[in-house]
Amino acid sequence: MEKDNDFKDPFLASTEEEELDPATQKALMEYLGVGSRASSLVSFSSTAVDIPPISGVGDFVREFRIESRKLWKLAGPAIFTTMSQYSLGAVTQVFAGHISTLALAAVSIENSVIAGFSFGIMLGMGSALETLCGQAFGAGKVSMLGVYLQRSWVILSVTALFLSLIYIFAAPILTFIGQTAAISAMAGIFSIYMIPQIFAYAINFPTAKFLQSQSKIMVMAGISGVVLVIHSFFTWLVMSRLHWGLPGLALVLNTSWWVIVVAQLVYIFNCTCGEAWSGFTWEAFHNLWGFVKLSLASAAMLCLEIWYFMALVLFAGYLKNAEVSVAALSICMNILGWAAMVAFGTNAAVSVRVSNELGASHPRTAKFSLVVAVILSTAIGMFIAAGLLFFRNEYPVLFVEDEEVRNVVRELTPMLAFCIVINNVQPVLSGVAVGAGWQAVVAYVNIACYYLFGVPFGLLLGFKLEYGVMGIWWGMVTGTFVQSIVLTWMICKTNWEKEASMAEERIKEWGGVPAEKETLLN
């Protein structure tokens, strides 16, 4: 297949595929490591054969039903998991709002700026496993998953040590970037309390991607759901009965994240993952540089997305009446985050489907999975937005006591509803990029669309033209819309047959495959 043909195939078109003779097929299967045991594992997440070309409405509807069921088996538990884990911080923020407006602003700034900065790096670096584990699992190289997991633990734990310095010096950092003295001081104290959380991230994110790549999502959902219930109870206890204030909120939030980590590790170590986990190995320290490169590319891609909306809250701190602006916008970002968890759940599902199918050399199934995911995500986003508009006068009461903040939130609700629809589709497109291994390319797209276009446009509307919070938000959402258009164009023009053939090369380059398997069918 020609190298210059990456973006020439119609999106759902038929392609001629060469038939391999039986001897070549056998050699290929041996090379890929797909024996009877491995192939049974592959079939759990990928289709037995690639779907036939879509040639009409009837074919589309039939395959849509089939793929929808496969996606929802993954997306349903993934959505529940992401919403439960996101709600840990959201519950903390809700209780902070009942302390004072300053406490809400401080916790919001810590969550959005300090923790948000670290969260983006750690989750992004952990997302390298979505590509490697997903494609390796699809190709039948199940035994490598545990090695990849341990490499990611090593890299992220070292990263957490460096990032903890940001937590320690959060107060002067926030003051330097222009936050008020009161917000900076309180957010700085809360940041120091939250240092244990970043080390939980270092273990949790790779572990979650390891389980996710094998479609073991139900156990993640169960753990997260139970922890959320416990977290909500103890947060209420330390705030409403013990009156421990911000230290109590930090104690409960840190503990909740570590309970999730320990529970997932117990599940893995209890021999529930078969060949995927065979114990600790020194091989985890081999080929770290190749793994670091993919981890950094993944981090760059995701951080540029997460920091983008983190910057929105930061810019609001420069407006007049900063405490009210930050508090109101943080409530909207909180709700947007909840809604985004649905999209991130679909992101996780489509990333698993795309990476597994590319690893199994099923390009048509991989790209059709994307089509289904985009349709479902758009419909869900519109449903959530409609409900939010209907209850726009009621829901602010749940977050804050200050009536001035509530009124600003009500004014921002139409913008929030529109943003939910856009942001429900964008993570799905990013999920395809992760599943296919395009992290580095998408990072450049994000820089151009978000930071060279969206941020300047938002600042122009918000400060120069004096539209305030609404103007900043409109400008930045426009950047997200442009990025989604670019990703859609890339996906539609991609040669998916070549992506499938490149999956094995990515596994070798980024994951480290034994040298004796370096050549395919000499």
Swiss-Prot record:
Alphabetical GO biological process terms: root hair elongation; xenobiotic detoxification by transmembrane export across the plasma membrane
GO MF annotations, alphabetized: antiporter activity; xenobiotic transmembrane transporter activity
UniProt cross-references to InterPro entries, sorted A to Z: MATE_euk, MATE_fam
GO cellular component, one term: membrane
CDD domains in UniProt: MATE_eukaryotic
A Pfam family that the UniProt record links to this protein: MatE
Keywords: Membrane, Transmembrane, Transmembrane helix, Transport
Disruption-associated phenotype: Short root hairs.
Keyword Transport: yes
Subcellular location: Membrane
Cysteine-cysteine disulfides: none
Recorded topology in the membrane: Multi-pass membrane protein
Main location: membrane
Transmembrane segments: 89-109, 113-133, 154-174, 183-203, 217-237, 249-269, 299-319, 324-344, 371-391, 415-435, 441-461, 471-491
Membrane is among the record's keywords: yes
Role noted for this protein: Positively mediates root hair elongation.
Recorded family membership: Belongs to the multi antimicrobial extrusion (MATE) (TC 2.A.66.1) family.
Record protein name field: Protein DETOXIFICATION 31
Species, as recorded: Arabidopsis thaliana
Lineage of source species: Eukaryota, Viridiplantae, Streptophyta, Embryophyta, Tracheophyta
Record gene name: DTX31
